[in-house]
Amino acid sequence: MEEILRDSRNAVEKYHDPSPYSMNMVALAPCSPFSASEELYRQSAILARDLGVRLHTRLCETLDEENYVLTKYGKRPLAYMESMNWIGNDVWYAHGIHFQDEELRLLAETGTGVAHCPISNMKLSSGICRIPDMLKLGVPVGLAVDGSASNDGSNLLEELRVAFLLHRLNSSITNIK
């Protein structure tokens, strides 16, 4: 873990450009609650805030992840992350499919963001992220492509198109008169 944190610090110090609209911003991003230790998450949060960079990880992507965190830590994934100070306007989570209502309100209240990856979520049958609900509550939402293992092209314009069509279809179900 010390090597990861040292390398992270070095990467931020060497490459991070905090100026507005910079295309060279570094974030600290342990992969997911089932592949990174609790201590790495805690120390990453401390380091990121010390260096003034953002935090990113996957969260609430699958029901398997939710069950893993509940079993191992006795908490829902967002409560687990909050216990390690992974909440706030410097944090964003990829996916966010399985957040409950009260968790969406917490995300909105704290300015914690969600990166929507609809193509990956469709390919893996993970579920549909509640983007319309998030936007109504004021959760910061971005659009992203996932890694190459679950996204065939890393095409952000295609991701935009699919997000539009997916949520148009999904919202039409509740708007039938």
Protein language model regions, located:
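Catalytic beta/alpha-barrel core
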Residues: 90-100, 117-123
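Metal-coordinating catalytic core of metallo-dependent amide/deamination hydrolases
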Residues: 1-97
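Short, acidic/turn-prone active-site loops that include or flank metal/cofactor-
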Residues: 61, 118-122, 147-149
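Histidine/acidic-residue-rich catalytic or RNA/ligand-binding cores of hydrolases
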Residues: 63-75, 103-108, 125-134, 151-168
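His/Asp/Glu-enriched, well-ordered alpha-helical/loop segment
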Residues: 83-90, 132-177
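Domain-wide signal for the mature, well-folded portions of proteins, strongly enriched
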Residues: 5-18, 26, 110, 127-129, ...
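Glycine-enriched alpha-helix->loop->beta-strand junction motifs that scaffold or abut catalytic
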Residues: 45-54, 86-89, 106-115, 136-141
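Divalent metal-coordination and catalytic microenvironments
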Residues: 28, 58, 93, 107, ...
